[in-house]
């Protein structure tokens, strides 16, 4: 809905829902440039409009995958240190985690900056690892879980293993071609 709102404000044809689903995961500017042929300047304006809607309504137009709360609770109780590394702006990610009462499971919630200085998934992952105090020699003890190719690429760029999950927005072909170490489905 947020992308549709932005495109309408820019007098752009929205197209089909399948194209809009591709926006989930990668940085918004990249998706606007790639799928709607926008210039960098137009994409930045699109992000501005996207956030007008998202900050008020879109942020809460989501739902929790079945079994996620139980899985997070189990992993935390088993002693795993859990964190979020998302291309979504950090302040939005924290609000969503609070809404669903998930913040309690995470040692940290890390995301992109609103000013665009931190948006690449690999950089967000590195930012999270640095803030968690994880040294590079211990990256072999870290596993990223993600549902899109940018999650896989970001983990690989940091030298960490990654599990591609099929319950999100990516599909098997996308996760395999990106090089996921493991594939899981719920």
Where do the PLM segments sit?
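Metal-dependent phosphoesterase signature
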Residues: 33-70, 78-80
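Active-site neighborhood of HAD-like aspartate-dependent phosphohydrolases
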Residues: 1-22, 36, 77
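A short, structured active-site edge motif that brings together acidic residues
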Residues: 18, 103-118, 140-141
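Conserved Lys-Pro-Asp/Glu-containing loop-to-beta segment of HAD-superfamily phosphomonoesterases
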Residues: 121-152
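Acidic, Mg2+-coordinating phosphoryl-transfer loop and its flanking beta/alpha structural elements
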Residues: 143-184
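Surface-exposed amphipathic alpha-helices with a cationic face
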Residues: 69-77, 129, 152-156
